[in-house]
């Protein structure tokens, strides 16, 4: 999942035509500044959230402080392994050099991984333990969503903070939101 060494895909990425002519058994996408787009004049790179097993949604909520189901609908791929999927998001250019790959765990729960930079994600083809990768939300039907600000802020916080055993997430709320929450 992480390429290193001379001659890897980052030094000489393939065109779509070259990929189709390779005759391989899978296709992956490069993350970070290797896969970019421009939306309304602003540049973005590709990032992903990899939910890795039973309870990974609980790990996400525990660490990030927000239910994973509140993420915007986006292109998503799965390997066929139980409770695993990878969700793709556009990351604003100003975050591309700040955010790093993070593998986050909670005891007795599946982990989740925030993926970017010198990583790639398999999106099609064979998988060693299943019938292969498949789209949960296909790019033919869904756009890749822009990562929500709360996710970017959390990710930036854990990338720039000195290592700590416990990371607490405070969700920034407006005065109106706090009043509404307290009136329930």
Regions found by a protein language model. Give the residues of each.
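Conserved phosphate/metal-binding and DNA-contacting active-site motifs used
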Residues: 1-180
């Amino acid at each position: 999942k992480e390429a290193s060494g001379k001659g890897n895909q980052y030094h000489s990425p393939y065109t779509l035509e070259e990929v189709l002519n390779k005759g391989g058994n899978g296709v992956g996408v490069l993350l970070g500044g290797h896969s970019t787009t421009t939306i309304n004049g602003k540049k973005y790179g590709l990032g992903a959230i990899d939910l890795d097993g039973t309870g990974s949604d609980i790990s996400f909520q525990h660490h990030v402080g927000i239910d994973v189901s509140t993420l915007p609908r986006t292109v998503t791929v799965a390997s066929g392994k139980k409770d695993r999927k990878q969700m793709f998001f556009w990351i604003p250019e100003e975050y591309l050099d700040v955010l790093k790959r993070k593998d986050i765990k909670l005891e007795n729960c599946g982990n989740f991984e925030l993926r970017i930079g010198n990583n790639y994600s398999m999106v099609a083809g064979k998988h060693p333990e299943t019938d292969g990768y498949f789209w949960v939300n296909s790019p033919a039907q869904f756009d890749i969503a822009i990562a929500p600000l709360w996710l970017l802020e959390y990710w930036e916080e854990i990338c720039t903070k000195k290592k700590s055993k416990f990371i607490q997430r405070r969700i920034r709320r407006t005065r109106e939101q706090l009043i509404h929450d307290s009136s329930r």
